[in-house]
Regions:
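GNAT-family acyltransferases
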Residues: 1-117, 150-154, 160-182
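Surface-exposed alpha-helical segments enriched in charged/polar residues
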Residues: 65-69, 129, 133, 137
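Conserved acetyl-CoA-binding loop-helix of GNAT-fold acetyltransferases
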Residues: 120-134, 157, 161
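Conserved GNAT acetyl-CoA-binding A-motif
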Residues: 137-148
């Protein structure tokens, strides 16, 4: 199996397709990253102060360029979430293998950024189904961690249904994480 950094796979499940983010996604992703209802649900932990609230095309372009450089450096993969049927780009996910001197060494971090009107259980379930089926092997991780703040009720329901359990301690100094292990 090729590394996700050699050849980035396209995944599909239910309502969505995931494919590597590129500059063609710029304008539609700006709708997600400028959505003031969505931004509080994004996981910006350990992102050097970036809260992912982008309000200009130029700032969105810079983010996509950074994601591309990070991909080339094998730091993380950022996929665009495309709603099938409408071919609408509704957000992104990020996934990476975490190396650390703590109990979550060799776990993956999954970030899910969705436009607020698409922050619904069925779409999140499809994202998690892809994650559960492919990401453990693709990223060589023994568990996947993702964040869901308490008011993210649809996300929390989807996480529990997909076998994720709350982590009742801080992860990298932060609260509100859920984990699924192999």
């Amino acid at each position: 199996m090729k590394s996700v950094y050699e050849e980035c796979p396209v995944y599909g499940k239910g309502l969505i397709t995931l494919r590597k983010t590129n500059n063609e996604d710029l304008e539609e992703l700006l709708e997600c990253y400028s959505d003031e209802k969505a931004v509080p649900l994004f996981n910006s932990d350990n992102c050097n102060g970036d809260n992912f609230n982008y309000t200009t095309i130029e700032r969105m372009r810079q983010a996509i360029e950074f994601w591309e450089v990070s991909y080339k450096n094998e730091e993380f993969v950022r996929w665009t979430i495309i709603l099938k049927g409408m071919n609408k780009k509704i957000g992104t996910i990020e996934m990476f293998h975490r190396n650390a001197d703590d109990e979550f060494n060799h776990y993956g971090i999954l970030r899910i950024d969705l436009q607020s009107k698409y922050e619904i259980q069925s779409i999140i379930e499809d994202i998690l189904a892809i994650s559960n089926e492919y990401f453990f092997e693709a990223f060589e991780v023994k568990g996947i961690l993702t964040k869901a703040i308490q008011k993210a009720e649809e996300r929390i329901c989807a996480l529990k249904k997909a076998g994720f359990k709350p982590v009742y301690k801080k992860v990298m100094g932060y609260d509100d994480y859920y984990c699924r292990e192999i």
